[in-house]
């Protein structure tokens, strides 16, 4: 049994991951915003499935720190796995998003991950072990027009998590990026749209493309061959079952759109960079000996 903290567990991938891992007998703490408010019913449902709901808003330092303290207090100071899942999506003409909208996007998708890592890593370093699974996207490797700002936040995670993996390898902490394709979750139902519709209107026919893309995507999600979002929970469970030191640094889930090829092509280049810096030893995680 492992102790796991999952962010963004009120719906979508996060909720499915929480329920899947709890069913496997793990001690799961499901991070949920407004746990006693609009998500009270969801919290009760998670609890019924064997997970422990924890109030957690990744955009607030105090909330993140309190959630990690609660987990450590309830588990006797143990935390084995952190799943960075909380995220929001955006779609539209990039110029028509305001700076405040982009800031909100990065606040959740990037800064939220940094908050969780700062809160959890001291425990992982002290233990000499830990696994951080971050839900990225294939759009952190390839670019879809009109999804560029969302993609930018996921590209940021790629560099961020790579650096953390090197820096924490000798402390026995592993990092894996899960890169899902498009799946029917409520993240798309609540996708961030441009606040400056007038600016988007200046693009004419091109400005109408994202709406058509979105309609096509929704049609695919509602069709008989819609991709199964449970694929992501299964990928996370498989990573957890893989022995320490043998996990891949990236896993593409669903239709790759070339992201898998990009991963394979970039890996030797990155290795050359690290070798050139004389830091090859940081590329291999130091696995804690079994007691």
In which residue ranges do the predicted regions lie?
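The beta1-alpha1 cofactor-binding region of Rossmann-like NAD(H)/NADP(H)-dependent oxidoreductases
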Residues: 56-69, 99
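Substrate-binding pocket helix/loop in short-chain dehydrogenase/reductase
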Residues: 93-94, 101-103
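Conserved glycine-rich Rossmann-like NAD(P)H-binding loop of the short-chain dehydrogenase/reductase
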Residues: 24-40
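SDR active-site lid
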Residues: 170-247
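Conserved glycine-rich cofactor-binding loop
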Residues: 10-11
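Active-site helix of classical SDR
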Residues: 117, 153
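Residue(s) in the substrate-gating loop at a strand-loop-helix junction
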Residues: 137
């Amino acid at each position: 049994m492992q102790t796991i903290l999952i962010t963004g567990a009120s719906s979508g991938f996060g909720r499915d991951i929480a329920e899947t891992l709890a069913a496997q007998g793990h001690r799961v703490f499901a991070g949920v915003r407004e746990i006693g408010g609009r998500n009270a019913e969801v919290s009760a449902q998670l609890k019924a499935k064997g997970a422990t709901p924890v109030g957690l808003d990744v955009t607030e330092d105090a909330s993140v720190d309190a959630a990690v303290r609660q987990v450590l207090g309830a588990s006797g100071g143990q935390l084995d796995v952190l799943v960075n899942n909380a995220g929001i999506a955006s779609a539209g003409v990039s110029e028509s998003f305001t700076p405040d909208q982009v800031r909100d996007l990065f606040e959740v998708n990037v800064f939220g991950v940094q908050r969780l890592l700062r809160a959890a890593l001291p425990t992982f370093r002290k233990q000499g072990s830990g696994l951080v699974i971050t839900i990225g996207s294939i759009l952190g490797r390839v670019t879809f027009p009109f999804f560029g700002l969302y993609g930018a936040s996921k590209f940021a995670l790629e560099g961020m998590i790579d650096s953390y993996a090197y820096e924490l390898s000798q402390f026995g902490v592993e990092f894996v990026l899960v890169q899902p394709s498009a799946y029917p979750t409520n993240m798309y139902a609540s996708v961030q749209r441009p606040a400056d519709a007038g600016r988007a209107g200046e693009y004419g026919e091109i400005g109408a493309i994202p709406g058509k893309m979105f309609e096509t995507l929704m049609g695919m999600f509602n069709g008989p061959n819609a991709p199964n979002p449970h694929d992501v929970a299964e990928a996370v469970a498989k990573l957890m079952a893989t022995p320490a030191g043998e996990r891949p640094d990236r896993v593409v889930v669903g239709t790759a759109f070339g992201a898998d090829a990009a991963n394979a092509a970039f890996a030797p280049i990155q290795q050359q960079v690290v070798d050139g810096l004389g830091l090859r030893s940081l590329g291999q995680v130091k696995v804690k000996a079994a007691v």
